[in-house]
Amino acid sequence: MRKIFVPETKDRTADAVVIGGGIVGTATAFWLSKAGLDTILVEARDGLSTLTTAASAECFRAQFTEPALAPLARKSIEFFEHFAENVGIPGWDIGLHQQGYLFVTDDESMIPDLEAALTQYHKLGVTDVELLTGDQVRVRFPFISTEVVGATFRQKDGWLSCHEVTQGFAKGSSARFFVKTKATDVFVDKKGVSGVQTTRGKISTRVVVNAAGPFAGVIGRMAGVDLPLE
């Protein structure tokens, strides 16, 4: 069964519609379909992950001090570490490289801040972050400036291919991914969202996920929601 394609023009129904075919929208469609919802993703461009996802630095890290963010990052990394198994595609390679993430400072007065960050990381369950002196940093990374006096480091941070992650989420999903299909309006009735008009027909639905990235404000206004985006 085709999953990523240009659909014929006709009206449809779906349990959920995701607008935007970047890594966030595609991951959302994956999890919605995994939860048993008949899901359609619509993407205006020729393919998935071709706009902001394609411009990503593609780095990931668990070194966050925000209580709401750190657990999400940690769980995401654990998912990436077993991505092929998790999406059900044996051998799918997302180019995962866990060669570490180093935060350095050349200011002695910042060392207490690094120590406080380390304490917070451990408190949030990220217990494999190290606090290094400048000399310890240069033993591992000889190219680091002699002006660096301290750093935090986590070996399991790194980078991956956002394109391959996006494609893996799509191909491992039971959702349908409509490319060259632009959302032009969002319909709302007394019960809430009722459908999405696209350049290839209307999709009746009660669930719409706005994953349009820089165009999220435009999509929001279609549904009468003014998002604070600039």
Predicted regions and their residues:
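Helical element adjacent to the flavin cofactor pocket in flavoenzyme catalytic cores
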Residues: T152-V207, A211, F215-V218
